[in-house]
């Protein structure tokens, strides 16, 4: 069965895994999902991920979740732009998540990056999700 929102599915798996106190979760592999996970690693929200071959030609990403003193590092992770409603933001209109304590993940012409990196690069794009 094809997913209508693969990034939203991965974010939901991460959210559910952290609420269930899992050490890792699995999600189908894709380049865009890996790019989003790279941003989460750079910003310190997950420990890491690895690509695992489940069957011949089918790969999944094992996402290692991160906890601080037994509590999930990710308190909130939510999809902003969906396939039915794309949300784009110019750099000057990019809102801060929880007054700068959280991040937004953007898909820009220069690649997938956090809102901090987008401000430094002076580039806007599609707001994929927000993390706190």
Curated annotation (Swiss-Prot):
One of its GO terms (cellular component) is ribonucleoprotein complex. The keyword Transferase does not apply. PROSITE patterns: RIBOSOMAL_S8 (PS00053). Keywords: Ribonucleoprotein, Ribosomal protein, RNA-binding, rRNA-binding. GO terms for biological process: translation. InterPro entries: Ribosomal_uS8, Ribosomal_uS8_CS, Ribosomal_uS8_sf. One of its GO terms (molecular function) is rRNA binding. One of the primary rRNA binding proteins, it binds directly to 16S rRNA central domain where it helps coordinate assembly of the platform of the 30S subunit. Part of the 30S ribosomal subunit. Contacts proteins S5 and S12. Belongs to the universal ribosomal protein uS8 family. This is Small ribosomal subunit protein uS8. It comes from Rhodospirillum rubrum (strain ATCC 11170 / ATH 1.1.1 / DSM 467 / LMG 4362 / NCIMB 8255 / S1). The gene is rpsH.
């Amino acid at each position: 069965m094809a997913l209508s929102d693969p990034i939203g599915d991965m974010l939901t798996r991460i959210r559910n895994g952290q609420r269930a106190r899992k050490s890792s979760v699995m999600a189908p592999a894709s380049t865009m999902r890996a790019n989003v996970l790279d941003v989460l690693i750079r910003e310190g929200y997950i420990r890491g991920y690895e690509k695992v071959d489940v069957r011949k030609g089918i790969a999944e990403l094992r996402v290692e979740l991160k906890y601080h003193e037994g509590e999930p590092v990710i308190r909130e992770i939510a999809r902003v732009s969906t396939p039915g409603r794309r949300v784009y933001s110019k750099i000057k209109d990019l809102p801060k998540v929880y007054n700068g304590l959280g991040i937004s993940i953007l898909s820009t012409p220069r690649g997938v990056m956090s809102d901090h990196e987008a401000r430094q690069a002076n580039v806007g794009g599609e707001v994929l999700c927000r993390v706190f």
